[in-house]
Amino acid sequence: MTNLTLALDAMGGDFGPRITVPATLQALRLNPLLKIVLVGDKSQIDEHLVSAEPAIKNRIEIKHTTEVVAMSDRPVHALRNRKQSSMRLAIELVRDGKAQACLSAGNTGALMAMSKVLLKTLPGIDRPALVTCLPAVNNTPVYLLDLGANISCDSETLFQFAVMGSVLSETVDKTASPKVALLNVGIEEIKGNDQVQQAGQLLQQIPQINYTGFIEGDEIYSGNVDVIVCDGFVGNITLKTSEGIARLLVHQLKKALGQGFFVRLLAKIIAPRIRSLLNQMNPDHYNGASLIGLRGIVVKSHGCADEAAFLQAITLAVTEAQRRLPQMIEDRLESILLDINS
């Protein structure tokens, strides 16, 4: 493993350096080959570095700026008027080859716009997509994309998302021939809108993609497929609904286990299993959505992420950088396009 540099928007998210800096310190303790460039207000960042070990601080660089992209900023406004923002400067470090990946918990639309303009998309890719990993009943990861970067998509864009999702599953999880499905209102070929039906027809013609057909919402967590593709409108609602249900289940389980002497006693006996279950159900365990299809690695964290959740997003960014995800997607897409045109 070689040394790796991560550019981190220290000011992004609901809590800024209060979360991003402690998570950075934890990540550096876990990975001795990692260096992190914290981009943001140096005075605020330094407040959270006072007690850090000297050996850890030696692997931190601070790039000072006081400008921040507000959560209320529209993407075009941020692109034109936030040229010295912590988010933009972090992305520029990736563009300039000074970092191998970028992470931000800030404004999603601004992150998408800046990343696309500064890093450009890969050959054959029209739009980047936000993708995240979801749990499944058989403990295998399921990738869902797009999560909101593209509210509406034509069939060609959905096809490109399917290719990128397949390569992501192969690269990050070493899944052999990942099963890819299109999220739809039914599994029959006549179901769904024109875009989804046409995307299905395109995927059926590509033997390199293990396309299994349509999948309905109740099968997302079944583990029957490895990659699920949809437009950003559907994907974002699906993800947020899932996170809400997961938090409800965790709350109800904790409440139930606290009622009655014998229930509390039983809960203590099986505490390790309960902790494992709660961890699997906790959305923070899966924090970090990748903006794939770019000539560089950009990861988006939840704005409300706590330290543990933000650390998870850092780990994701490092993993993708180590496995050279953009290059893997580009190589695979080039191979598929050559076969189509031959």
Swiss-Prot record:
Catalyzes the reversible formation of acyl-phosphate (acyl-PO(4)) from acyl-[acyl-carrier-protein] (acyl-ACP). This enzyme utilizes acyl-ACP as fatty acyl donor, but not acyl-CoA. Its EC number is 2.3.1.274. This is Phosphate acyltransferase. It comes from the Bacteria. It comes from Shewanella halifaxensis (strain HAW-EB4). GO terms for biological process: fatty acid biosynthetic process; phospholipid biosynthetic process. InterPro entries: FA_synthesis, Phospholipid_synth_PlsX-like. It holds the Pfam family FA_synthesis. Homodimer. Probably interacts with PlsY.
